Design a protein with these regions (language model features):
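Catalytic cores of nucleotide-sugar-dependent glycosyltransferases that transfer UDP/GDP/TDP-activated
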Residues: 1-465
């Protein structure tokens, strides 16, 4: 395993974002955590440094360290076959067959062999009484070995689906021997609990967003315009981006950021979906819905689909992106002129996060047309920014949006007409859209910021120790 360095981030800065009651609760939780975990290490183990899990750890662990907790982050080592098995498990946990490969005895033997080697690397580091948080299916097989070391083990599964079937059963059959040995299992929704786990072994902890992270911190309109112009996402003169120290620095080159349609014109109202290039995010469905509802939309409305630049080895993402580009090519010329596809540069993690932040703040309406969703942090991010959101009622999106109160939900995730009807309503009723956006921001402040997330883990550790 390799170590990801974690620096402290001031909890006081997070507390300053909260109301007085929440801030006092956070301070009390900090003191309790320091007492509970004195002399212990909290190990977090993930399959990768990037992705949604990496983003959560990158924001949560610095706060824990500032609170006096020895929080550390380890990333698995593995060969290509191990990560193919992990990716297969990840897909199947969403009831998606993925690459269609096996999850049988040979795969189990390889999985256990790689994790055994990882366990050996930290044998002298993890002490009895430490707390180990294992994130997602790739790490679950470490639970028995960590328990033998005397650690208290929590398996945190960030995945799940509301429609369990035979595909999902394959993943649980593979994972059950290890997961059943964890002291506690943390899920994002109660409906994600498999039958072999008793209810008292499971805790439900929703993810959160950090209001001070590059993806979610405040950006004034000038900064939003500058970021989007620099990246070539919205038309306008490109200028240097201002770094965290206040000094100008060149933005990443915009070449290739727009894959279709060119920059969104300045002054256009943008309907945005920003997601991974993942079949279950249904970017192609959003594009088709826009085309089918095009005649009902005002002439100043443009669609922007934005995802991260596709890594050379990620054939699944490349297939989704290529499918969107093929659909775009087949659109009527007047629709193509108002539909845009972008791949956001990933060479600078902070810059990528700032671009997502700027896109969400720039959008007139944010869409999340997922076919399945574990929780849906892109929805949380847009809600935090006070944007009116149209999303499909799948997974954890249902726990974030109350239809007509802080967003609009489409019950059937395949309902293209329903999505565009909701979008058109928000564009036609700006006062209603603004009310939804304000309610959305307020709900995230109450329920989905880092303070609540941290305190729930303090409660969980208190149970175990």
């Amino acid at each position: 395993m390799r170590t990801v360095e974690v620096s402290a981030a001031p909890l006081a800065a997070l507390a300053a974002e909260l109301d007085e009651v929440a801030a006092r609760r956070l301070t009390a939780g900090e003191e309790r955590a320091r007492r509970l975990l004195a002399g212990r290490t909290v190990w977090n183990v993930s399959a990768a440094e990037g992705g949604g899990v990496g983003e959560l750890l990158r924001t949560m662990l610095p706060y824990a360290r500032d609170g006096g907790v020895d929080a550390r982050w380890l990333v698995l080592d593995g060969d290509a076959e191990f990560f193919r098995i992990a990716a297969r498990l990840h897909a199947v946990m969403h009831a998606d067959p993925g690459d269609g490969g096996e999850l049988g005895p040979e795969e189990m033997a390889h999985y256990d062999r790689v994790l055994g080697a990882n366990l050996e690397e930290v044998r002298e580091s993890v002490a009895s009484g430490d707390v180990v948080l294992l994130h997602d299916p790739a790490t679950a097989g470490l639970a028995p070995g960590m328990r033998r070391r005397g650690a208290r083990v929590i398996w945190r599964c960030h995945l799940g689906t509301d429609a369990p079937d035979g595909i999902l059963d394959r993943a649980w059959a593979f994972l059950e021997p290890a997961v059943a040995q964890a002291d506690r299992v943390v899920l994002s929704r109660p409906t994600y609990r498999p039958g072999f786990l008793e209810a008292d072994a499971v805790r439900v902890i929703a993810p959160s967003v950090d209001p001070l992270s590059p993806k979610n911190r405040r950006l004034d309109p000038t900064a939003v315009s500058r970021l989007l112009a620099d990246a070539g996402l919205v038309g306008g003169a490109a200028v240097a981006e201002q770094g965290a120290d206040g000094a100008d620095r060149p933005a990443e080159p915009a070449d290739g950021a727009m894959r279709a349609g060119g920059p969104v014109p300045p002054g256009a109202r943008t309907v945005l979906q920003v997601s991974r290039w993942d079949r279950l995010k249904d970017m192609s469905g959003v594009l088709i819905a826009f085309a089918e509802g095009f005649d009902e939309l005002p002439e100043d409305v443009h669609l922007l689909l934005a995802g991260a630049a596709v890594a050379p080895h990620d054939s699944a993402a490349a297939d989704v992106l290529d499918g969107c580009l093929e659909i775009w090519q087949g659109l009527e010329p007047q629709v193509r002129a108002r539909a845009h596809v972008a791949c956001l540069p990933t060479g600078d993690r902070e810059h990528n996060a700032l671009l997502v932040n700027a896109l969400q703040r720039h959008a007139a309406v944010v869409v999340q047309k997922s076919l399945a969703e574990g929780f849906g942090l892109t929805v949380t991010e847009a809600l935090w920014k006070g944007r009116p959101v149209v999303a499909t009622a799948v997974g954890g999106i249902q726990d974030q949006i109350t239809d007509g109160t802080n967003g609009l939900l489409v019950p059937d995730p395949t309902d293209l007409h329903g999505v565009m009807t909701c979008v058109a309503r928000l564009l036609a009723e700006p006062a209603f859209a603004e009310r939804l956006g304000q309610a959305a921001h307020d709900r995230v402040r109450r329920e989905f910021l880092s303070d609540r997330h941290l305190l729930q883990y303090v409660d969980l550790v208190d149970e175990l120790l």
